[in-house]
């Protein structure tokens, strides 16, 4: 399949513009401690015109959230290999920072940055992995029902990717990709509990080896409805048009066609649901179901269809946070086949993922964290199958103002 460029997979239903770990602080809300003086002042001043005005402290111009995480663990398949697995202990560090400007009149601004580095202590082929992600977003509200946002995202990835896109050469490789994506989002709050959003973006990916350099255009439409009793649902359609700088088309038999240019179009349809319940809503559950149809501009050699489901559960008892994410995906290729003979089987690929994360707050700023991640890919072509297990244990420091 094509190596897919960076695409934000939004699982949250209301906003989902930042990673899952930062969904809660994405919106600037007036705390209860600041709301109480307002109520008290209005009560005391009713009928007392001569009473002195209550001084209400102004909100700070900027809100800041920062965290640093350090973990140690073990990964049993660094190269995503079906044989000859390379295993290693690992050390990983992650830093995050979120800046939000207090809305002034109709404008608001936020920026989020995340950096992550992994060192494999016994790695031979792969010694290090790293990634960096930066997003800035400027918002403008011309009216109470309209919001225009312009996010700009830059990213860098240096890691092992699965490049199993042909049956001629199925492999994994260490790739370095630098990219950026930018484009406007226009949201219409047509009801107090529903909104409609249209978005467009342009994306550029540059690889260290130049193998998959190209441009991608995005266009999408999303609908979200907040129901009663903590229920929320949504649906969306997203289209992506990708043009490679140097990749060429393939014939139906898997041969390169010199002098051609490869392009593709992906249409993705999704349905999402979420629910919060309990006192102070410690329980959260989400579910996303999607279908993707990919077509190339040549013989259809890279045509494929994907079905994916993503359940997610979160529980926040006092001092704890437990998060479970799972995903299952099936990929069916239209022309690519496996085996030899007069009637070879169409190529099929199944992928499964599960991730468990546990956090225990030890103090206002410190937390202990542990996690386990499992990934499995199965295909009727054995060389494209692999399994990965990763366990982590460490600490997290966070600060906000």
Model-assigned labels for residue ranges:
Residues 46-401:
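Gram-negative and organellar
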Residues 1-60, 400-401:
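Cleavable N-terminal export/targeting peptides
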């Amino acid at each position: 399949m094509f190596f897919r460029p960076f695409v934000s997979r939004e699982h949250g239903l209301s906003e989902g513009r930042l990673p899952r770990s930062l969904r809660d602080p994405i919106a600037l809300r007036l705390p209860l401690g600041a709301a109480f003086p307002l109520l008290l002042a209005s009560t005391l001043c009713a009928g007392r015109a001569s009473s002195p005005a209550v001084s209400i402290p102004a909100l700070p111009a900027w809100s800041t959230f920062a965290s640093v995480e350090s973990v140690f663990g073990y990964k049993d398949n660094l190269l995503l290999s079906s044989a000859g697995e390379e295993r290693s202990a690992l050390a990983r560090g992650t830093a995050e920072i979120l800046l939000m400007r207090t809305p002034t009149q109709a404008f608001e601004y936020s920026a989020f940055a995340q950096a992550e580095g992994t060192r494999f202590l016994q790695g031979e082929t792969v010694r290090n992995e790293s990634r960096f992600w930066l997003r800035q977003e400027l918002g403008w509200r011309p009216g109470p029902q309209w919001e225009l946002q312009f996010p700009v995202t830059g990213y860098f990835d240096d890691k092992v990717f699965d490049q199993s896109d042909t049956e001629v050469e199925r492999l994994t490789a260490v790739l370095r990709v630098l990219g950026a994506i930018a484009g406007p989002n226009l949201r219409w709050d047509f009801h107090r509990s529903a909104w409609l959003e249209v978005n467009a973006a342009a994306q550029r990916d540059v690889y260290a080896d130049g193998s998959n350099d190209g441009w991608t255009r995005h266009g999408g439409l999303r609908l979200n409805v907040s129901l009663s009793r903590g229920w929320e649902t949504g649906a969306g359609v997203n289209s992506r048009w990708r043009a490679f700088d140097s990749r060429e088309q393939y014939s139906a038999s898997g041969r390169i066609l010199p002098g051609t240019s490869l392009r593709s179009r992906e249409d993705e349809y999704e349905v999402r649901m979420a629910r919060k319940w309990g006192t102070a809503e410690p329980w959260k559950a989400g579910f996303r179901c999607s279908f993707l149809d990919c077509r190339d501009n040549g013989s259809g050699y890279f045509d494929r269809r994907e079905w994916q489901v993503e359940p997610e559960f979160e529980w926040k008892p006092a001092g704890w946070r437990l998060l479970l994410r799972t995903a299952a995906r099936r990929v069916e290729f239209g022309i690519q086949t496996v085996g030899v003979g007069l009637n070879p089987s169409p190529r099929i690929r199944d992928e499964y993922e599960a991730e468990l994360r546990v956090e225990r707050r030890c103090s206002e700023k410190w937390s202990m964290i542990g996690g386990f991640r499992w990934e499995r890919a199965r295909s009727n072509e054995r060389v494209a199958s692999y399994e990965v297990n990763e366990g982590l244990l460490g600490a997290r420091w966070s600060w906000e103002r």
